[in-house]
Amino acid sequence: MTKTPLTIEEPIFSHLPVLPQEVITGLVVRPGGRYLDVTVGGGGHSRLILEAAPDVKLTAVDQDGDALTAAKQELAEFGEQVKFVRSNFAAYDFPSTSFDGVLADLGVSSYHLDTPERGFSFRHQASLDMRMDQRQSLSAADVINDWDEVELANIFFKYGEERLSRRIARRIVEKRPFHTTTELAEAIASSVPPKYRYGRIHPATRVFQALRIVVNDELKSLETFIEKAPKALVPGGRIAIISFHSLEDRLVKHGLRNSPLLKVLTKKPIIATDDEIANNPRSRSAKLRIAEKQAETGDEDN
């Protein structure tokens, strides 16, 4: 009997912000406070911050023009309380000691996964794009079709934690060029043993994660953000970061801990309750870490 490979293991994404109460509690949103959401997306967390206390001011940042358009619509009622900025959070010009709280939600939005032309998911046939900021030039197609076999194997292993990285890279080089997400996913599936091919998750899952990380320089951007963001906090201000896979969480954990400006408040990451996971499956893999700007540390220190 012929088996049909399982589709990618993805939560059924919704527009609900993950860990909503935990974020608001962790940031200690106060009346008249100034907050920075560097991954505004559709505006879910930003709305919660704006509604948590009166006279809150919020700067909403995103590198994706489509996300900013959606956020402007979602947050229109707050008028001049919200300032919108299109920027990658690593490139954002953080003003010194300006915010009571900074939030980053590192998850890929349902919009990106469910919009075929963006090329983030192989559930849909689409061009190999994966650019969060469509103003940039490097796409997933460039990586897959132009990088050599060793480079591909290395990124699949490093950023996708894919143990069959060499085998998959060899097949990709043999079969390329690739033009669509589904073509690539099929080639990956055909390169692995049947037990792996019909496993719990689609064999292309980790490769697609690695490609997305490389195309958007996600981990380097995260490192830069964690280095720069604390300087933008007032003494006693807090930074909250939500990650969704182990590579991100490791960087967040060590980045917050190693910052001379911060005191980590979460010994272990905050995770979703069973009730939240039932209502919002995307929250299943979310991990929230929070740190506070040290009052006695000057902003001139690195």
From Swiss-Prot:
Region Disordered, residue ranges: 276-302
GO terms assigned for molecular function: rRNA (cytosine-N4-)-methyltransferase activity
CDD domains: AdoMet_MTases
GO cellular component: cytoplasm
Residues annotated as binding S-adenosyl-L-methionine: 43-45, 62, 89, 105, 112
GO biological process: rRNA base methylation
InterPro entries, A to Z: RsmH, SAM-dep_MeTrfase_MraW_recog, SAM-dependent_MTases_sf
One Pfam family named in its UniProt record: Methyltransf_5
Main location: cytoplasm
EC code: 2.1.1.199
Superkingdom, taxonomy of origin: Bacteria
Annotated catalysed reactions: cytidine(1402) in 16S rRNA + S-adenosyl-L-methionine = N(4)-methylcytidine(1402) in 16S rRNA + S-adenosyl-L-homocysteine + H(+)
Keywords of this entry: Cytoplasm, Methyltransferase, rRNA processing, S-adenosyl-L-methionine, Transferase
Cellular localization per UniProt: Cytoplasm
UniProt family annotation: Belongs to the methyltransferase superfamily. RsmH family.
Function: Specifically methylates the N4 position of cytidine in position 1402 (C1402) of 16S rRNA.
PANTHER family reported for this sequence: 12S RRNA N4-METHYLCYTIDINE METHYLTRANSFERASE (PTHR11265:SF0), S-ADENOSYL-METHYLTRANSFERASE MRAW (PTHR11265)
Name the record gives this protein: Ribosomal RNA small subunit methyltransferase H
Source species: Nostoc sp. (strain PCC 7120 / SAG 25.82 / UTEX 2576)
